Amino acid sequence: MKIAIASDHAGFRYKELVKKHLASKQIEFEDFGTNNEKLCDYPDFIAPAARALQAQKVDRLIVLGGSGNGEAIVANRFRGVRCCLCLNAEMARLARMHNDSNAISVGQRLIGENQLLTIVDTWIDTKFEGGRH
């Protein structure tokens, strides 16, 4: 599995934590930026990452911002990207299980650091249920 990851300035710190976590689990990733906490426009980083998912250059996508809302909106503009805002592990589990989400958006200002990696792991480890979904 290869995961694209991108953030704006408000999600940069959590993006760096997710990258370290993915590396520790030997999960390949590609970082689309931003590369610091300097104010920036999130679509500049989210759109290229979503394009990579759309083009099947990566298997999944994680985007991060202040609330995660704008990032999810941008990601979902690309055909084939199914990005769900996940504020807890249950949302991440259902995003995969029922919605076959191939992308998640996380809000750094809305969740605690202790929740972040649980959300990511739950989303990565959960299988799509299929069937009526």
Report the location of each language-model feature.
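Short, solvent-exposed amphipathic alpha-helices that sit
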Residues: 13-24
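Alpha-helical segments flanking ligand/cofactor-binding loops in enzyme cores
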Residues: 47, 51, 73, 93-96, ...
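Short active-site oxyanion
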Residues: 2-3, 58-61, 80-82
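Short, structured active-site "lid" loops
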Residues: 45-63
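C-terminal binding/interaction regions
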Residues: 4-6, 10-13, 89-133
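A short beta-strand-loop structural module common to alpha/beta enzyme folds
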Residues: 28-39
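Mid-chain, well-packed structural core segment of small domains
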Residues: 63-109
